[in-house]
Amino acid sequence: MSTAPQLVVHRDKELMAQAAAARLITRIVDAQASRGSASVVLTGGRNGNGLLAALAAAPARDAIDWSRLDLWWGDERFLPEGDPERNVTQAREALLDSVPLDPKRVHAMPASDGPHGTDVDAAAAAYAQELAAAAGPENHGPVPTFDVLMLGVGPDTHVASLFPELPAVRETERTVVGVHGAPKPPPTRVTLTLPAIRTAREVWLLAAGEDKAQAAAIALSGAGEIQAPAAGAYGRSRTLWLLDGAAASQLPRSLYPPASA
């Protein structure tokens, strides 16, 4: 079931990252208190990595039991292990290498020099199997229940590696697919699909900067998900857009309360 998006607009991208990090700490701690563990889907890009860096610098990060946290990824650039452009490599540098995570609960997407070689479709199928193995009978489909799933929003409204009009955004059954011919490098990627994204309890969409203003306006104005993938990303209980003032500059103020600016 779709949830109407809530908007929170911060003064600048630094404040947005700090506030989002504080919000994420609270969600993780609450999930661990109520269910014993938490499950979060990370996003790459400047806003996703900025949030992780803010979390690394937050004293309250120690409230998290890092050994009871599962980390997944919404998408990945299909490159060799350790490549600096891979989302997992950047996440390790920003946060993961500085906290006591259980390595078995860090679920990176396959690399192009892994057991599946350069077969991105086989790599995507393997990640789908890993998700299915972690799902329980109480979960919504063949994926575990994600407490928070974060997505960066591209200037073209793409989220994860779901680009406008490409086959991946049209997928209705599979939870993970390989992407061929992405319009930004590298062209080959692995991504969660919209059906997988929509199983999350909460979906957070992050956008900062003037180059994201038109994308936010399009996605929040009722555009179709094939033309504007961000419009099709929503959670079961909450959909949250976290923006800075520049990214919100083309939105009518009626969409968000003045107090959030």
Which residues does each predicted region cover?
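Glycine-rich beta-strand-to-loop/alpha-helix junction loops that act as flexible
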Residues: 42-47, 151-155, 208
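Glycine-rich N-terminal segment of FAD-binding domains in flavoprotein oxidoreductases
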Residues: 32-58
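Ligand-binding beta-strand-loop-alpha-helix segment within the catalytic cores
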Residues: 3-4, 64-147
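A glycine- and small-aliphatic-rich helix-loop capping segment at beta-alpha/alpha-beta transitions
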Residues: 54-65, 89, 164-173
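Short, conserved loop/helix-junction motifs that constitute active-site signature segments
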Residues: 60-70, 99-101, 168-169, 195-200, ...
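ATP/nucleoside-binding phosphotransfer catalytic cores, i.e., glycine-rich phosphate-binding loops
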Residues: 195, 201-261
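Class I SAM-dependent methyltransferase SAM-binding "motif I" and its flanking Rossmann-like core
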Residues: 148-195
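N-terminal glycine-/serine-/threonine-rich phosphate-binding loop
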Residues: 1-40, 121
